[in-house]
Structures are given as C-alpha cells and as structure tokens.
C-alpha cells in the first residue's frame, strides 16, 4: 500500500464509523457504512497475495449484499411509514430485513462463514481491525433499534452464533481463525442481551475490544499465526509466556479475570427477566471456547517442539517494537473484575 494513501484510507474508515454511530437518519447511516466498507478493502489487501485478494473479494461481496438488504429495508420503511429516523422503524418486515443485514455485517450465524476466511487471509493487525473496529457501526445501529427488534429472532441468531463459534474453533490450528470463531461467539452474547438491557451490550463490546486487542498485540509481537509457532514463545520472547495464557483465559471468560464480567452480568440480566434455560444453554456451549483456549495455553507454556535446534534457549533475545499501551491493556484484561460494581453503577 502506498504510504501516502494510508492516512486517507484510515481517516475514511474512522469517519464512516463515526457518521454511522452519531447519525439518527437512515440515509447518513447507510452512507457511513458504505464509506467504511469501501475504505477497509485496501486494508485487507495491504500485503498483496492471492489469499488477501480472495479475502477482500469475500468481504466485499458479503458487505455489499448486506448493504443492499439494508437499503431495501430503509426504502420500504420510508414508503410505509414516511419516517427516515432510526428510532421510528415500526414496520415489522423492515425491522426483520435490517436485523438480517446487520447479522451479515457482524458475522453472526448463519451468515458467519466469511469471518474466519477473511480473517485468515489478512495480516494480524488488519484482522484486529476487522474483528473490533468494524463491529462498532453495525452494533450502534442495533443499539438504536433495540426497542423495535424481534426478540425471538435475535435470540435464535445469538444462540446459533454461540454454537457456531464454539464448535467451529475446536479443530483449528490457525490462530486467526480461532480468534474469528471467538468473535462470532462474543457477538452472540452481545446480541442476546440487547433487547433486555442495551447498556450491557455496550459493556460487553468494550471488554471484548480490550481483550481482543490485547490478544492480537501479543501474537503480533511474537509473530505467531499457528499453534506450532505459539509453542516457540518461551525461547523467543520469554516474558510473553505468562501473559498469553492469562489473556486467553480472560478471553474465555474464566473468573476472576475481566472476561468473566460480561458473562456474569448477561446471565444476571436474563435471570431478572425470569429466563433460565437460555443463559444456561449459552454458558454450557461457551465452555467449548474455554477448551480450545486451554489447548492454546498448553501449546504456549507446556509443549516443547520436537526439533532440538528450535528449542534451544537463545543467548540474545530479539528486539521488539515498543508497544506503550500493552501494559495498560494487559492490566485491564486481567484485573478489571474488582472494579465491576463501579462500572455497573455508571451504566
């Protein structure tokens, strides 16, 4: 990618997201989504290869289809109700089409097949943007429409996403695909609580972004993209050996780490609404996520490579790029649970 084009591309991505998040008019919301989508395609092909080109095409086709469905829903809602504001989407069919379009953009099941493939075909940092920043605009639309969503359809999509994300990551050895399936599971948890308490969705999204950003930065420091490369952490960057397992356990939602907080408050919210079967099912299925995180932890801190030349301790470690925000992110990833009452009081 041309260095001169990078500021323009990233500025367009951020501007498109902010236009969508801050707008209450359907036309400007759609324009922001299109700006964001078209500017993100060069980021996916930052390192030109057949795999990245394929990933960009898959991303474009999926997002363009979702945008077409969204535009059709916006126009039909305007024809039937005469309203352009997002909070006045009263037509049931328009609401269903908008939910379908947003599920495609978020990568929720059964529209999730593009997420692992696109994430696998991009560099780690582009994958980080795909799984974090690109979720903000669709979730903001769902947040503003939370009062007019079809609860049964949303819960069905959420449970399907949790199942697809948990089962899909079981036999994977590619770290980017594992994190993509983890993202699908987290999207299911966020959308499940949206009709009951939208603020809990925002809390879940914030913690998810912190955990995912920390994980990607640690893997990028180690240049790890597979479980085999992850097992070389101890003799390449020794100080990462305790940090990667703790981050992965938090991403899996194990108490007393930060990742347990969103699952705790979501289950509590369902309990307040006299719903026990749905959160129990979600929690049991999510245990599969914890299983494949434990596999990664085993590869990082316990497994030794069979090649003797690769397992010798290096006498001089590699210099890594400075990451000033990483200590703060690691602290937030592991130690945020004790201040959760204060966070819940703000919400």
UniProtKB/Swiss-Prot annotation:
<comment type="function">
    <text>Core subunit of the mitochondrial membrane respiratory chain NADH dehydrogenase (Complex I) which catalyzes electron transfer from NADH through the respiratory chain, using ubiquinone as an electron acceptor. Essential for the catalytic activity and assembly of complex I.</text>
</comment>
<feature type="transmembrane region" description="Helical">
    <location>
        <begin position="149"/>
        <end position="169"/>
    </location>
</feature>
<feature type="transmembrane region" description="Helical">
    <location>
        <begin position="274"/>
        <end position="294"/>
    </location>
</feature>
<protein>
    <recommendedName>
        <fullName>NADH-ubiquinone oxidoreductase chain 2</fullName>
        <ecNumber>7.1.1.2</ecNumber>
    </recommendedName>
</protein>
<feature type="transmembrane region" description="Helical">
    <location>
        <begin position="326"/>
        <end position="346"/>
    </location>
</feature>
<dbReference type="GO" id="GO:0005743">
    <property type="term" value="C:mitochondrial inner membrane"/>
</dbReference>
<feature type="transmembrane region" description="Helical">
    <location>
        <begin position="247"/>
        <end position="267"/>
    </location>
</feature>
<keyword id="KW-0249">Electron transport</keyword>
<dbReference type="Pfam" id="PF06444">
    <property type="entry name" value="NADH_dehy_S2_C"/>
</dbReference>
<feature type="transmembrane region" description="Helical">
    <location>
        <begin position="13"/>
        <end position="33"/>
    </location>
</feature>
<dbReference type="InterPro" id="IPR050175">
    <property type="entry name" value="Complex_I_Subunit_2"/>
</dbReference>
<comment type="subunit">
    <text>Core subunit of respiratory chain NADH dehydrogenase (Complex I) which is composed of 45 different subunits. Interacts with TMEM242.</text>
</comment>
<feature type="transmembrane region" description="Helical">
    <location>
        <begin position="55"/>
        <end position="75"/>
    </location>
</feature>
<keyword id="KW-0679">Respiratory chain</keyword>
<feature type="transmembrane region" description="Helical">
    <location>
        <begin position="96"/>
        <end position="116"/>
    </location>
</feature>
<keyword id="KW-0813">Transport</keyword>
<keyword id="KW-0496">Mitochondrion</keyword>
<keyword id="KW-0999">Mitochondrion inner membrane</keyword>
<dbReference type="GO" id="GO:0045271">
    <property type="term" value="C:respiratory chain complex I"/>
</dbReference>
<dbReference type="GO" id="GO:0006120">
    <property type="term" value="P:mitochondrial electron transport, NADH to ubiquinone"/>
</dbReference>
<keyword id="KW-0472">Membrane</keyword>
<dbReference type="GO" id="GO:0072593">
    <property type="term" value="P:reactive oxygen species metabolic process"/>
</dbReference>
<feature type="transmembrane region" description="Helical">
    <location>
        <begin position="178"/>
        <end position="198"/>
    </location>
</feature>
<dbReference type="Pfam" id="PF00361">
    <property type="entry name" value="Proton_antipo_M"/>
</dbReference>
<dbReference type="GO" id="GO:0008137">
    <property type="term" value="F:NADH dehydrogenase (ubiquinone) activity"/>
</dbReference>
<keyword id="KW-0812">Transmembrane</keyword>
<feature type="transmembrane region" description="Helical">
    <location>
        <begin position="201"/>
        <end position="221"/>
    </location>
</feature>
<keyword id="KW-0520">NAD</keyword>
<dbReference type="GO" id="GO:0032981">
    <property type="term" value="P:mitochondrial respiratory chain complex I assembly"/>
</dbReference>
<comment type="similarity">
    <text>Belongs to the complex I subunit 2 family.</text>
</comment>
<dbReference type="InterPro" id="IPR001750">
    <property type="entry name" value="ND/Mrp_TM"/>
</dbReference>
<keyword id="KW-0830">Ubiquinone</keyword>
<feature type="transmembrane region" description="Helical">
    <location>
        <begin position="123"/>
        <end position="143"/>
    </location>
</feature>
<dbReference type="InterPro" id="IPR003917">
    <property type="entry name" value="NADH_UbQ_OxRdtase_chain2"/>
</dbReference>
<dbReference type="InterPro" id="IPR010933">
    <property type="entry name" value="NADH_DH_su2_C"/>
</dbReference>
<keyword id="KW-1133">Transmembrane helix</keyword>
<keyword id="KW-1278">Translocase</keyword>
């Amino acid at each position: 990618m041309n260095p001169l084009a990078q500021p323009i591309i990233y500025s367009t991505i951020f501007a498109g997201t902010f236009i969508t998040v801050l707008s209450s008019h359907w036309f400007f919301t759609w324009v922001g989504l299109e700006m964001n989508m078209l500017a993100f395609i060069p980021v996916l092909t930052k390192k030109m290869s057949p795999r990245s080109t394929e990933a960009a095409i898959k991303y474009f086709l999926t997002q363009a289809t979702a945008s077409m469905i969204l535009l059709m829903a916006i126009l039909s809602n305007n024809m039937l109700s005469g309203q352009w504001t997002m909070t006045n989407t009263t037509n049931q069919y328009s609401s269903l089409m908008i939910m379908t379009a947003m599920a495609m953009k978020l990568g929720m099941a059964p529209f999730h097949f593009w997420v692992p493939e696109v994430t696998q075909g991009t560099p780690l940092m582009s994958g980080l943007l795909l799984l974090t920043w690109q979720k903000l605009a669709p979730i903001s639309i769902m947040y503003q429409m939370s009062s007019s969503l079809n609860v049964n359809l949303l819960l069905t999509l959420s449970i399907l996403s949790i199942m697809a994300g948990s089962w899909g990551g079981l036999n994977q050895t590619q770290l980017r695909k594992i994190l993509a399936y983890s993202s699908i599971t987290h999207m299911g948890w966020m959308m499940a609580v949206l009709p009951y308490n939208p603020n809990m969705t925002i809390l879940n999204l914030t913690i998810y972004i912190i955990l995912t950003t920390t994980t990607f930065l640690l893997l990028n420091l180690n240049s790890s993209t597979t479980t085999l490369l992850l097992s070389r952490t101890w003799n390449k960057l020794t100080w990462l050996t305790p940090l990667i397992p703790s981050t992965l356990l938090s991403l899996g939602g194990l108490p007393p780490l930060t990742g347990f907080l969103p699952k705790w408050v979501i289950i509590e919210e369902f309990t307040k609404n006299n719903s026990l079967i749905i959160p129990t099912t979600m929690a049991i299925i999510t245990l599969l996520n914890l299983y494949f995180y434990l596999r990664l932890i085993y590869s990082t801190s316990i497994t030794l490579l069979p090649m003797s030349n690769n397992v010798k301790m290096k006498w001089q470690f590699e210099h890594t790029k400075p990451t000033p925000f990483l200590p703060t992110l690691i602290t937030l990833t592991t130690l945020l649970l004790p201040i959760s009452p204060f966070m819940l009081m703000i919400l």
